[in-house]
Amino acid sequence: LFSILLNEPLGIQTIPTEAETMSKEERFEELEQLAWQEALYDPGTLDWKEKWFLDGSRSTVANTEKGMILSAGPLEQDHACHTVLWTKNSFEGDVKIEADFWRLDTATRNVNIIYIQATGREEGPYTKDIAEWSHLREIPYMATYFNNMKLLHISYAAYGNQDDAREYVRARRYPTRPDLKFNELDIPPDNFETGLFEPGIKHRFTIIKKGHELLFKVETEEKMSVFAWNTSAFDLITEGRIGLRHMWTRTSRYADIRISVL
């Protein structure tokens, strides 16, 4: 019988997943071999408006021969300068997300985030279909998302809000609740100083969410890392849109974006 593990920060029990009975790398390879079916493909070179919509009036999206450049607005501390690029499609069940990524900024603070299967919390104006309340996100204030959306979040090429902050990869599960503050949404473990995400270097991302398993593989020509989290302290995320979030001043290029389901 599996033992029950205690998630100390939340006081919530988690149930061990298959990823915790083998190495992260072995489990990732096992999951990657499943019968995934492509549900979206975007090379990044075509008109982004065909498959995406944008939160943030001060951000830009540019399609180039090398991929799609997503740029947040230029002013730090101006919440209108955040951005989120959302898929028009919603994806149900288990999901695999792949993309080539190049960091184009040299920032040492603020974060990039991928939002996985986002829906509204279904209270007040925050209906299940997040496209229905896009007007409430013309200024993409972070709290609007973590208070009012159900989703999984992975931070990458991420830093704190101080220049000497350490680079990290972190997972979270939204939304907050009266008994659960934003800093309690973390899914352990955090991963600091990964040695990844140098500006101008091509990274291949592959994210797999299967049941309560969440894995993130990052590859460059010189390095490969797999990050893994057990999300079972929270209710299962089962459907929703995929979003790319850049905080103010952050800029990156994405290409060969593929989303698959089982």
Regions found by a protein language model. Name each.
Residues 4-21:
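Bacterial Sec-dependent signal peptides at the C-terminal "C-region" and cleavage site
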Residues 16, 20-262:
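Extracellular glycan-recognition regions
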